[in-house]
Amino acid sequence: MPKRTYAMRYVAGQPVEQIFPGSAKQLGQGLPPGAPLPTTEFLRVMVWNIFKQQRAQWLSVLKEFGRDAQLMLLQEAQTTPELVRFATSHYQAADQVPAFALPQHPSGVMTLAATHPVYCCPLREREPLLRLSKSALITVYPIHDGRLLMVVNIHAVNFSLGVDVYSKQLEPIGEQIAMHRGPVILAGDFNAWSRQRVNALQRFAQGLGLEEVEFSTDNRSRAFGKPLDFVFYRGLTLADASVLVTRASDHNPLLVEFQP
């Protein structure tokens, strides 16, 4: 029997909570009310494959480069005490999808948010060659103008022949984005290291009316000359986008600002 996919929610002063996928039907029928993401002038989103916090300085990058980010989308986030402490002291809620369990702390995508989500749907896809899982997380947050913002945090499968498994991981995400009426941010480590994968990803994004964030100084981490990390969006106005060059991970973090 396959393992059931779930997210772990970390909130300051509360026991860790296991969250099972919400019904996608809710997206078209109305979600429960919630407190909006606090925004002043901009909605700041940091996106980073944090390499299981294996290198020094990862915490200072989160604190400094990610300062004032209302949303933090991490991949390969390992729930060590240090990361959980940072998440719960700086954010209202942190939801992680354990892709696979390491000896002590599970690793997977983790979304840190300045308010609680009103919808949460964890997803996993197994790497066909390594038999390891990659995870994704769909969350929805109210924003100040009354709309609901869908946020998709993804770590795409890496080792596969062709793009069938790659596209299969995107399918359930696309179905939920298509059902959502409001603005969307889709971001993460897409492992788009081949022309086939880039084409599949661009077709996927265009089919959903998503625009790709472009970086004027593009220092994104690359494999075979192709960037691995992307941010796509709709229903928001892009204000700024930057990449920090750092040795704190094997990926450089992205910081994107939107005008909601």
Swiss-Prot record:
The keyword Cytoplasm is assigned to this record: yes
Coiled-coil regions, chain positions: none
GO cellular component, one term: cytoplasm
InterPro entries, per the entry: Endo/exonu/phosph_ase_sf, Endo/exonuclease/phosphatase, UPF0294
Subcellular location: Cytoplasm
UniProt entry keywords in alphabetical sequence: Cytoplasm
GO MF terms held by the record: catalytic activity
Keyword Cytoplasm annotated: yes
Family: Belongs to the UPF0294 family.
NCBIfam families per the UniProt record, alphabetical: PRK05421.1-1, PRK05421.1-2, PRK05421.1-3, PRK05421.1-4
HAMAP family: UPF0294
Protein name in UniProt: UPF0294 protein YE0917
Native source organism of the sequence: Yersinia enterocolitica serotype O:8 / biotype 1B (strain NCTC 13174 / 8081)
